[in-house]
Amino acid sequence: MAIRPLHDRVILKRAEQESKSAGGIVLTGSAAEKSTRGEVIAVGNGRILENGEVKALDVKVGDTVIFNDGYGVKTEKLDGEEVLILSESDILAIVE
């Protein structure tokens, strides 16, 4: 299934998170934190400015990003895989 986000929305695939603590203990369930890194798999056309112009997004498909996993992040299933839909403003950094 193809998906195209609107405006300043970005669709991410969450990166796999290590499930061991620094001391080597295997973490399960709620003890294992979800990663706040992801790969951009789709981007919208851009943010609509007050004057009506569209400003292109700073992130692009294939970027690895660090994001704020809080209010406003929507989780959906796409072809059996979990994806996240969020605004570009919820992205904190691009990993280079």
Swiss-Prot record:
Organism: Alteromonas mediterranea (strain DSM 17117 / CIP 110805 / LMG 28347 / Deep ecotype)
Family statement: Belongs to the GroES chaperonin family.
GO annotation terms (biological process): chaperone cofactor-dependent protein refolding
Subunit structure: Heptamer of 7 subunits arranged in a ring. Interacts with the chaperonin GroEL.
Transmembrane segments: none
Xref: Gene3D superfamilies: GroES chaperonin
Main localization (coarse): cytoplasm
SUPFAM superfamilies reported in the protein's UniProt record: GroES-like (SSF50129)
Underlying gene: groES
Described function: Together with the chaperonin GroEL, plays an essential role in assisting protein folding. The GroEL-GroES system forms a nano-cage that allows encapsulation of the non-native substrate proteins and provides a physical environment optimized to promote and accelerate protein folding. GroES binds to the apical surface of the GroEL ring, thereby capping the opening of the GroEL channel.
Top-level division of the source organism's lineage: Bacteria
HAMAP family xref list: CH10 (MF_00580)
Keyword terms: Chaperone, Cytoplasm
One GO term describing the cellular component: cytoplasm
Subcellular location: Cytoplasm
Protein name: Co-chaperonin GroES
UniProt xrefs under PROSITE patterns: CHAPERONINS_CPN10
GO molecular function, one term: unfolded protein binding
Entry annotated with the keyword Cell membrane: no
